């Protein structure tokens, strides 16, 4: 690698709206984010069960269309 052309990496604190703080190495300054792994529903346990949402009967419509009952 060439010397003097790469940005300096430093330890920064990423602060989430939920109050959690995570430390990473980055060339940027401190960062604020809206969601993180501490507050996102997928990582809180609602993700696997809550990912399939059938609000308009799409699954039933598919089963009926292809006779999968």
UniProtKB/Swiss-Prot annotation:
RNA-binding as UniProt keyword: yes
Gene3D superfamilies referenced in this protein's UniProt entry, alphabetically: Ribosomal protein L31 (4.10.830.30)
One annotated GO molecular function: rRNA binding
One GO-annotated biological process of the protein: translation
Cofactor entry: Zn(2+)
Residue positions binding Zn(2+): 16, 18, 36, 39
GO annotation, cellular component aspect: ribonucleoprotein complex; ribosome
Keywords: Metal-binding, Ribonucleoprotein, Ribosomal protein, RNA-binding, rRNA-binding, Zinc
Domain of life of the source: Bacteria
Free-text cofactor note: Binds 1 zinc ion per subunit.
Membership in a protein family: Belongs to the bacterial ribosomal protein bL31 family. Type A subfamily.
Protein name: Large ribosomal subunit protein bL31
Organism: Thermosipho africanus (strain TCF52B)
Phylogenetic placement of the source organism: Bacteria, Thermotogati, Thermotogota, Thermotogae, Thermotogales
């Amino acid at each position: 690698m060439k010397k003097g052309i790469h940005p300096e990496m430093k330890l920064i604190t990423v602060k989430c709206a939920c109050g959690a703080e995570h430390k990473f190495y980055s060339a940027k300054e401190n960062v604020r984010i809206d969601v993180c792994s501490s507050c996102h529903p997928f990582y809180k346990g609602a993700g696997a069960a809550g990912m399939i949402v059938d609000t308009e009967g799409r699954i039933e419509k598919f089963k009926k269309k292809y006779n999968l009952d």
